[in-house]
């Protein structure tokens, strides 16, 4: 579909107030064929304060015909139209997977998406929970008569002909639980993950290029800047977005005095609501790009710093066992739900990404300062359990 053919109705996501993330009720979708006539990704974007990253759904053709959907995205008219095109060639959607128990940005789409495919079985990761009340799945919008919990053994499900999967035992964080299900597609030797692994591209993903405003907003150095739309500025904005998204507040970022922030807003050249009325409470250090390069690690597989410091290190032994089981599969490529995709990587590279569980962090300790401070606060007030000792 050409850009001229897109209308606001095509992009409509009416349930955005449930999880009010940018771009709210208007979401573009890009479909990419990864393996010819076999595997496709559907990308949208979402975030807060223009800290936006891709969110990805994977669709795979089953050997017996029909389609498998991993981690649905917002079922906008554009997205459903692209799905119908695949159905017309490869058969109807048979299975829809909710592979996470904690990612509300993934959960919110599953029920509305499933309504467009009334014959599909919806499989969900075990130990689902909701906050502030732990509600039945049907109350969360999932179809009651065709939603099933994934059993521990993939061979006991109809999925076993095409896939193996491994469920990460639920990690009790006191304030909630974390778990996800990794799927391995035998034919394409593709590993599917939700949040457990990422690879950071140097340049902005295509879905962010469709509307570069968030990239250019974060490319600014001061509130007074009017940033020209160039590839270099888009790249700078993307790399800073990555630092925000994965570190919250990297050490190369200072927050100026709020009196100065408001004073600068009065002199900003763009004061629209879109530009937050000129407010720009960020001051980047000269070596911010070095911090990005350290984080990116030349595009290798990594575990997001937030997961390294606040979540996966709570049940180290169980996480390592989960990683070891996944590493037995003959992986050739990895498709996570965020950042780069597809990633050409094997089982050994996947396993190495989790080396922080038994060794020192492979990211610079100074860059983890904010996250470790959050960790110390949560543990001190007994809001989360303390991290395990490294094995």
Task: Name each region found by the language model.
Residues 73, 85-95, 101-104, 108-116, ...:
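Cap/insert and terminal regions of metallo-dependent hydrolase folds
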Residues 87-159:
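Active-site HxH/HxHxD metal-binding segment of metal-dependent hydrolases
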Residues 70-73, 97-102, 106, 124-126, ...:
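Short His-Asn-centered micro-motif
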Residues 64-66, 90-93, 119, 187-189, ...:
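A general structural motif
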Residues 2-81, 135-223, 246-254, 258, ...:
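Catalytic core of the metallo-beta-lactamase
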Residues 50-51, 77-80, 104-107, 131-133, ...:
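Short active-site-adjacent helix-start/loop capping segments
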């Amino acid at each position: 579909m050409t850009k001229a053919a897109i209308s606001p109705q095509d992009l409509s996501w009416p349930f955005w107030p449930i999880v009010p993330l940018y771009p709210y009720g208007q979401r573009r979708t890009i479909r990419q064929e990864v393996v010819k006539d076999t595997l496709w990704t559907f990308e949208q974007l979402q975030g807060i304060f223009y800290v936006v990253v891709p969110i990805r759904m994977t669709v795979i053709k089953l050997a017996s015909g029909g389609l498998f959907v991993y981690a649905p995205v917002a079922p906008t008219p554009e997205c459903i139209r692209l799905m119908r095109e695949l159905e017309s060639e490869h058969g109807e959607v048979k299975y829809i997977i909710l592979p996470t128990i904690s990612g509300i940005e993934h959960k919110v789409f599953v029920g509305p998406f499933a309504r467009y495919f009334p014959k599909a079985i919806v499989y969900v990761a075990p130990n689902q929970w909701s906050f502030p009340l732990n509600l039945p799945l049907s109350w969360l919008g999932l179809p009651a008569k065709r939603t099933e919990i994934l059993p521990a053994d993939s061979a006991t499900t109809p999925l076993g002909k095409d896939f193996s999967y491994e469920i990460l035992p639920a990690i009790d964080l006191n304030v909630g639980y974390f778990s996800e299900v990794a799927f391995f597609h035998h034919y394409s030797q593709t590993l599917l993950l939700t949040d457990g692994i990422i690879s950071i591209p140097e340049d902005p993903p295509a879905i962010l290029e469709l509307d570069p405003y968030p990239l250019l907003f974060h490319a600014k150095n001061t509130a007074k800047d009017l940033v020209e739309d160039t590839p270099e500025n888009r790249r700078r904005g993307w790399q800073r977005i990555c630092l925000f998204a994965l570190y919250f507040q990297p050490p190369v970022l200072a927050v100026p005095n709020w009196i100065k922030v408001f004073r600068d807003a009065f002199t900003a050249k763009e004061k629209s609501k879109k530009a937050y009325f000129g407010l720009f409470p960020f001051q980047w250090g000269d070596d911010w790009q070095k911090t990005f390069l350290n984080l990116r690690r030349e595009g290798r597989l990594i575990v997001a710093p937030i997961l390294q410091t606040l979540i996966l290190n709570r049940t180290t032994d169980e996480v390592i066992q989960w990683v070891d089981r996944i590493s037995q599969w003959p992986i050739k490529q990895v498709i996570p739900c965020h950042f780069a995709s597809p990633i050409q990587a094997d089982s050994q590279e996947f396993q190495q990404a989790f080396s922080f569980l038994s060794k020192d962090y492979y990211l610079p300790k100074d860059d983890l300062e904010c996250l470790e401070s959050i960790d110390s606060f949560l543990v001190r007030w007994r809001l989360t359990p303390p991290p395990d000792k490294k094995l």
